[in-house]
């Protein structure tokens, strides 16, 4: 065998091994893909049985798996990081987030990006920590559950996390309602499966329906639209039953008529825009634009807001029988997460 043939043979073997490894990976990801049903019951832990008195306070906060504080950036936003450099970074952020919840008491807390067992957050069970710290009833719905995410370099690896609702109220039932998935195979095998976490609380013969949400981020825009449409269909159906509806979280879309935070970064991620006409008559957004609710993670946060891309993408939707007293963004200056919490105060009418 000539030298040239030996070289070609070695190259062929290497290519065959690479193809085989890719095939094995695709088979593994396909077999282990998280495939939740359209509606699934969610367990509620805790013993609190408090009933609503008509006055309700809800706090929503995307905690960024306690891995996206002021010193972190994120590769999908134009940064370079996949996870914090040290486990202590996550622990410090998580402690700060927990203290924020204790210092701002609410009847219900909608948490997004709460990890349970993920490489990116050093396998810390953040949901368990926050539930134990607050002493509230807890319900968790996974929206990201992958045995292995094989990108970028270094790889994300295992992810288990999702939506966490903490509440003092006695929850009659909780469910995970699946939202449309915009991704196709094989990308879908290790990507997010967005959902609503719905908690039902009895109130004067009807239900207070608490809806925790986190809509699509890194899609072409069609996923956000489809998920928003399904969200509104669900909310209006609940209101037509006579229920009180409070939906809140990270919409990954800016709210109508907010111009305080113009686009200064046109190269990286940008949110969608919610349609000003999407709400039926009597419904309303509850949003506070006096402070930003989110920052772009193209780099660590320097504190210079004029040079930081800011957004208002976190807030609430209220049914007509829920009266808005106030809504306030708690400006923590992105100390522990890339989002600021938002506090809602309402009356059930």
Where are these regions (language model features)?
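Solvent-exposed loop/turn segments at secondary-structure junctions
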Residues: 65-66, 115-118, 144-148, 171-172, ...
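N-terminal, active-site-proximal structural segment of metallo-dependent hydrolase catalytic domains
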Residues: 3-136, 140-151, 155-160, 349
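Active-site beta-strand/loop signature of hydrolases that rely on acidic residues for catalysis
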Residues: 56-63, 93-123, 166, 199, ...
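Surface-exposed cleft-lining segments at the edges of enzyme active sites
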Residues: 80-86, 114-116, 179-188, 214-222
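Beta-strand-turn-beta hairpins that frame and shape the catalytic cleft
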Residues: 48-58, 70, 159, 163-173, ...
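Short proline/glycine-enriched turn/loop segments at secondary-structure junctions
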Residues: 153-154, 186-188, 301-307, 331-335
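Metal-dependent phosphoesterases centered on the DNase I-like endonuclease/exonuclease/phosphatase
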Residues: 219-320
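Low-complexity, intrinsically disordered Gly/Pro/Thr-rich segments
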Residues: 322-333
